[in-house]
Amino acid sequence: MSGLRPALSTFIFLLLITGGVYPLLTTVLGQWWFPWQANGSLIREGDTVRGSALIGQNFTGNGYFHGRPSATAEMPYNPQASGGSNLAVSNPELDKLIAARVAALRAANPDASASVPVELVTASASGLDNNITPQAAAWQIPRVAKARNLSVEQLTQLIAKYSQQPLVKYIGQPVVNIVELNLALDKLDE
């Protein structure tokens, strides 16, 4: 019985620290130092939440830039179904899937001349990625320009404006947030 008291008091102490103090401290510090990120990096227009800067959305119309394929098949970009998605390179189903995606992209972008960018036919590790390279966005310019009656120059400037450089220049590559880019396209129409 004498050994039970130290074990119980240690349990209660650790329960309070790990179940109360630590979560409250990290929540308070997160809200204080990084309020936008701690609340989901939400993109707002006035009081309306239009999306998150961290999760892609399913833009399908010709007047929008399309992101990477979502791995969450039933409901695209569903964060509750996030997970690994790509088939192994040795799997013949991957070749069929990529060929079907390339054919669909070619049909939707008949004026695009270069080969289809790889990130437009392969899902990301989470299946929720909202970023593509500026080159993948530029590949879609003819379709978007035609659908929105905008010039190639306007869209090129918009892509450049919403391109984000990596924190360290030689680690990573520039990316474009598709959600922010498409919301900016909608603002051009207003």
Swiss-Prot record:
Provide Cytoplasmic-side residue ranges.
Answer: 1-5
Keyword Ubl conjugation part of the UniProt annotation? no
Mapped to this chain, the residue ranges on the Periplasmic side of the membrane are: 35-190
Highest taxon in the source lineage:
Bacteria
Question: What GO biological process terms does the UniProt entry carry, in alphabetical order?
Answer: monoatomic cation transmembrane transport; potassium ion transmembrane transport; potassium ion transport
What cellular component terms from Gene Ontology apply here?
plasma membrane; potassium ion-transporting ATPase complex; potassium:proton antiporter complex
Can you tell me where the transmembrane regions are? Answer: 6-34
Give the UniProt family note. Belongs to the KdpC family.
Kindly give the HAMAP family that the UniProt entry links to this protein. Answer: KdpC
The record's function comment reads: Part of the high-affinity ATP-driven potassium transport (or Kdp) system, which catalyzes the hydrolysis of ATP coupled with the electrogenic transport of potassium into the cytoplasm. This subunit acts as a catalytic chaperone that increases the ATP-binding affinity of the ATP-hydrolyzing subunit KdpB by the formation of a transient KdpB/KdpC/ATP ternary complex.
What is the name attached to this protein's record? Potassium-transporting ATPase KdpC subunit
Biological source species: Escherichia coli (strain K12)
